[in-house]
A protein has these predicted regions:
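N-terminal helix-turn-helix DNA-binding module of bacterial transcription factors
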Residues: 1-35
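Intrinsically disordered, low-complexity polar regions and short flexible loop motifs
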Residues: 94
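Bacterial carbohydrate/catabolite-sensing allosteric modules
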Residues: 13-17, 55-66, 84-90, 103-104, ...
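Short beta->alpha connector loops
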Residues: 73-76, 97-102
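Short beta->alpha junction loops
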Residues: 69-76, 161
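Short acidic active-site motifs
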Residues: 25, 78-82, 104-106
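Interdomain hinge and pocket-entrance segments immediately C-terminal to HTH DNA-binding domains
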Residues: 22, 31-45, 63-65, 91, ...
Length: 168
């Protein structure tokens, strides 16, 4: 609502005297926005995932959002628990690097929660969300071509486990 002009000074004085701080939880109950985005990663040990977090966090802060980050360490149960927690905590969106969940599990945890999700680096087949993927095959072909152009003939590929989408 509106505040009468003659009351503004006394309100500001009371705010300063009481060192009042906005309660983000109370605000989110009224506005239905938490100004927080969940970031769910398999690990921070790999430089790629650390860079996903750091870049996302920077952009979120620039736009007035806070990040809530969880790592599930390739553990199916933790991935499921953290996804459920972040959605239940009322995040306004989710940046998610999936690894173990099926479409059915994902739908069960996110059903009736209108939370936008961006899957990064991998995707759960059958889940309708925005997706950011690397062109790994194209990049590998370019790298091998460059090595061949420079005279290399004995070229090996060291990849991750075939169960991880980006290693296929």
């Amino acid at each position: 609502g509106s505040v009468r002009k003659e009351n503004i000074a006394s309100i500001r004085s009371a705010i300063a005297q009481l060192d009042y701080r906005v309660d983000p939880i109370a605000r989110s109950l009224k506005t239905r926005r938490s100004h927080s985005i969940g970031i769910l990663l398999p690990s921070l040990a790999a430089p790629f995932f650390s860079s996903v977090f750091l870049a996302s966090d920077k952009v979120l802060r620039e736009h007035g959002y806070h990040s809530l980050m969880s790592c599930y360490y390739a553990d199916h149960g933790l991935e499921r628990d953290y996804l459920g927690y972040l959605i239940s905590a009322g995040v306004d969106g989710l940046i998610y690097v999936p690894e173990n969940l099926t479409a059915e599990e994902f739908q069960e945890l996110t059903a009736h929660r209108d939370v936008p999700v961006v899957q990064v680096d991998r995707m759960i087949p059958g889940v309708d969300s925005d997706i950011v993927l690397s062109e790994n095959k194209r990049s590998a072909c370019l790298a091998v071509s460059r090595l061949i152009d420079r005279g290399h003939r004995r070229i090996a590929l060291v990849g991750g486990p075939s169960s991880v989408q980006t290693a296929k």
